[in-house]
């Protein structure tokens, strides 16, 4: 089997296509969650705790200075506010995935498995067995 044909069969399998669709939807969902956290949740929490904008929270380790040549040396800053926003995004995404998986499991568990119908061979063998018992 040629390399190209093997690759084509691999790509056309259902799991790979499903994964590709999931990645695209996941990327779009990530953008939605980012907007939700940055534009709605963080400002609301900021208002509740005294008007704080989480994205601007930071800790300055070393202030900006000007060296002897007159060139500005930037400040050394830890921007922990963005980290807080990222944690909020993670929690929202994890919760959304939890709800989706819970709903899928509920749907799967509600559907009873159809009873297996025996094949014609099995039915014929049962008839032979029953007739031999008589």
Swiss-Prot record:
One of its GO terms (cellular component) is plasma membrane. GO terms for molecular function: mechanosensitive monoatomic ion channel activity. It is found in: Cell inner membrane. Pfam families: MscL. InterPro entries: Mechanosensitive_channel_CS (IPR019823), MS_channel (IPR001185), MSC/AndL (IPR037673), MscL_channel (IPR036019). Its main location: membrane. The keyword Ion transport applies. Homopentamer. This is Large-conductance mechanosensitive channel. The gene is mscL.
């Amino acid at each position: 089997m040629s390399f190209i044909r093997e690759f084509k069969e691999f790509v056309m399998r259902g799991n790979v296509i499903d994964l590709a669709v999931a990645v695209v939807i996941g990327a779009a969902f990530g953008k939605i969650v980012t907007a939700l956290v940055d534009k709605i949740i963080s400002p609301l929490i900021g208002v509740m705790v005294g008007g704080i904008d989480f994205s601007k929270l930071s800790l300055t380790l070393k202030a900006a200075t000007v060296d002897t040549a007159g060139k500005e040396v930037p400040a050394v800053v830890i921007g922990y506010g963005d980290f807080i926003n990222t944690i909020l995004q993670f929690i929202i995404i994890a919760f959304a995935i939890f709800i989706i998986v819970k709903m899928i499991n509920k749907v799967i568990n509600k559907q009873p498995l159809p009873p297996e119908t025996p094949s014609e061979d099995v039915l014929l063998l049962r008839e032979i067995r029953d007739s031999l018992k008589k």
